[in-house]
Swiss-Prot record:
Gene: rplC
Database matches in Gene3D superfamilies: 3.30.160.810, Translation factors
Entries under Pfam families matching the protein: Ribosomal_L3
Keywords: Methylation, Ribonucleoprotein, Ribosomal protein, RNA-binding, rRNA-binding
Family assignment from sequence similarity: Belongs to the universal ribosomal protein uL3 family.
GO molecular function terms noted in the UniProt entry: rRNA binding; structural constituent of ribosome
Full protein name: Large ribosomal subunit protein uL3
Modified residues (N5-methylglutamine): Q153
Amino acid sequence: MSLGLVGRKVGMTRIFTDDGDSIPVTVLEVGDNRVTQIKTDETDGYTAVQVTFGTRRASRVTKPLAGHLAKAGVEAGEVIKEFRVDAARAAEFQPGANISVDLFEVGQKIDVQGVTIGKGYAGTIKRYNFSSGRASHGNSRSHNVPGSIGMAQDPGRVFPGKRMTGHMGDVTRTVQNLEIAKIDAERKLLLVKGAIPGAKGGQVIVTPAVKARAKKA
């Protein structure tokens, strides 16, 4: 895994190219990610860079976590995240260091992970785009039901994976190969082409794309 940044989704807007083309972009706030720990093979069995992002009141921090952050000399954040890297990459950082938007560049392909917007308990029409039943002509009570969910005594069960009503949204999703359209280093913002899962203010994890294709010469 490559080193990345933890951030927050600000919302969507558009930017215009020199040719006048409109590009829809998602604005991500990726302020300073403060390094809280460097994990090594000798002490932890693997190498990683642990960071925190955002701010949190001291009254909301547990004593073990407060001690962990104090040892690194960093302010408490909303979340702690690890990025597994090789030993050489991990050796470039020390606890207390800041990692910012200069980790990325305009035009770079990235993967963005977020938690989708929760929709609550949803029916099959909303959840899986099922078609509804007939509005009339003999149909009086089953307009939006999914229909049959199985067969008879054989097999006598509902097969796993059957699409039915249930909780929709609020799941972790990763969108791959998004392109960075613009970087605002002063305000620590990334403007990314396209949509990103999650609500405004939701936490996101930005990493270099794992499936990025090299540009042809």
